[in-house]
Design a protein with these regions (language model features):
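Selective transmembrane helix interface/packing segments
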Residues: 1-227
Length: 227
């Protein structure tokens, strides 16, 4: 079955990402059906985590942009986090049909392209048309070519930052499982849990910065410097 899917161009990473999407959707449906007016237990923990995440991004984006675009940022963070953690399962990248999506360059590239077009759409919507692109001529008009290059470098940077870290991490862990005693790979797995979280946070953080810049109006103070 897996070989047939691979033969028609459906990669292992695509299969895994589809499974992860289904898992997240099922978890969201189950959680949605169990929402209580007075939260307790698991719901309380989830709500606390979302509040902390919202507070973190509000400090980066500002209240207006965060309140409006937090669902997009949170979705990116959660989805990439699940994809990163799929690489922690032994034999990820070796078993047929199973590869951490973020260790395949096409997946980070796709996520980066989504962010790129989201920034353009949000900017055009917030500034009601092509006035959004006035920022490409600031502070002086002759830097326009450099500003255009910067816009296209951003998705490339997002792609290879995420891909390089996760691919390298997965390769190292699989090598350690093959050649070292059990204890050390387990320690590496624990460190990888932290690294997977950091990489998901970095990607969504940069996306949040780009989106907040696109949503920023001239009368607002700058949220942050260009990165």
């Amino acid at each position: 079955m897996i070989e047939k899917l691979n033969a028609i161009g459906i990669s292992d990473a695509m299969i895994t990402s589809t499974v992860i999407t289904a898992i997240i959707c099922v978890l969201a449906i189950i959680a949605g059906r169990r929402i209580e007016m007075i939260p307790s237990g698991f719901q309380n923990m989830i709500e606390l985590g979302i509040e902390k995440l919202h507070g973190f991004f509000e400090g980066i984006m500002g209240k207006y942009a965060c309140d409006k675009y937090f669902p997009l940022i949170a979705t990116l963070f959660i989805y990439i986090l699940f994809c990163n953690y799929s690489g922690l399962i032994p034999l990820a990248g070796e078993a047929p049909g199973f590869q951490a999506p973020t260790s395949n360059v096409n997946f980070p590239a796709g996520m980066a392209i989504i962010v790129f077009f989201a920034v353009q759409i949000i900017g055009l919507a917030e500034h009601r048309g092509i006035r959004f692109y006035k920022h490409l001529f600031k502070p002086v008009a002759f830097i326009f070519p450099l500003m255009v290059i910067e816009e296209f470098v951003r998705p490339i940077s997002l792609t290879f930052r995420l891909y390089g870290n996760i691919y390298g991490e997965e390769a190292v862990i699989n090598s350690f499982f093959d050649i070292l005693p059990l204890g050390l790979p387990i320690i590496m797995q624990a460190l990888s849990v932290l690294m997977g979280l950091i990489q998901a946070l970095v990607f969504s953080l940069l996306a949040a910065i780009y989106i907040s810049e696109a949503a920023e109006h001239e009368e607002q103070l700058p949220v942050t410097e260009h990165m």
